[in-house]
UniProtKB/Swiss-Prot annotation:
Entry-linked HAMAP family: CheD
Catalytic activity: L-glutaminyl-[protein] + H2O = L-glutamyl-[protein] + NH4(+)
Lineage: Bacteria, Pseudomonadati, Pseudomonadota, Betaproteobacteria, Burkholderiales
Enzyme nomenclature, EC number: 3.5.1.44
Job of this protein: Probably deamidates glutamine residues to glutamate on methyl-accepting chemotaxis receptors (MCPs), playing an important role in chemotaxis.
Organism expressing this protein natively: Ralstonia nicotianae (strain ATCC BAA-1114 / GMI1000) (Ralstonia solanacearum)
Any Pfam family matching the protein: CheD
Family per record: Belongs to the CheD family.
SUPFAM superfamilies: CNF1/YfiH-like putative cysteine hydrolases
Gene3D superfamilies assigned: 3.30.1330.200
Descriptive protein name: Probable chemoreceptor glutamine deamidase CheD
InterPro entries linked to this entry: CheD-like_sf, Chemorcpt_Glu_NH3ase_CheD, Cytotoxic_necrot_fac-like_cat
Molecular function terms from GO: protein-glutamine glutaminase activity
Keyword annotations: Chemotaxis, Hydrolase, Plasmid
């Protein structure tokens, strides 16, 4: 288990937890939408904490003392928090596989841009400040069967780093690429992150979910992509 930092912060009165999917806007990504009413809450006995699973194509932003948990193969996840207020969130996404330009304006790159911007926007809505953000990124492994030659994981990892660089947002820590799936545990209220490397055969169900997500992305990216969202602070 790899641990990425821990820092206690004062707690203040905050808005309610925000939950939604990062499955794009109407049209292009409609088939990816997860029900906003569905929840993935559970009690994690290993860490004795209330926890919330974040599945492929989703994000979760919270002001509560929750642990956010996801399993990553080729997908990437940004764990972002306001280090003064303890507001934080996590996303889980990948770029659609396309034989196209790597321009930030290409359809697949716009998908990744949206996945990052919707998380940041929801954090700002909850009260987070850009200048107080602490960002750690994970995933991008070469694990999806039949997709290794496309360097899907590497492409995802490079995208998230380039997006943050272009936005002027520093990366506090990262654990990207390699060939092993990862299980990521993130506690926004403290900043503590634990990463467990998994054996591929031991996480078949999670990777199957990611493979289905990749297939849906490939089919839906043909629709007209949404325009870039505007960030606000």
């Amino acid at each position: 288990m790899i641990e990425f930092g821990k820092k206690a912060v004062p707690r203040a009165a905050m808005p309610d937890t925000v939950r939604s999917d990062s499955g794009m806007t109407a049209g292009a990504m409609a088939t990816l939408a997860q029900s906003a009413a569905s929840t993935h809450a559970y009690y994690d006995t290993t860490f004795s904490r209330r926890a919330m699973k974040v599945l492929p194509g989703e994000y979760y932003v919270t002001t509560e003392d929750l642990m956010l948990v996801t399993v990553l193969g080729s997908c990437v996840s940004a764990c972002v928090r306001d280090k003064l207020l303890g507001i934080g969130g996590m996303n889980h996404f990948m770029l659609p596989s396309r034989n196209e330009s790597e321009s930030i304006l290409s359809p697949s790159m716009r998908y990744g841009t949206h996945a990052m911007e919707v998380l940041l926007n929801q954090l700002y809505r909850a009260g987070a400040r850009r200048e107080h953000l602490e960002i750690k990124v994970f995933g991008g492994a070469a694990v999806l069967a039949g997709m290794s030659t496309l360097d899907v994981g590497e492409r995802n990892g490079k995208f998230v780093l380039e997006f943050l660089r272009s936005e002027g947002l520093p990366v506090a820590a990262k654990d990207l690429f390699d060939v092993h799936p990862r299980k990521v545990y993130f506690v926004p209220s403290t900043g503590q992150i634990m990463v467990r490397k998994l054996r591929s055969q031991g996480s078949a169900a999670e990777l199957d979910s990611e493979a289905q997500y990749a297939s849906k992305l490939s089919r839906s990216i043909a629709d007209k992509p949404a325009s870039r969202l505007q960030l606000f602070t």
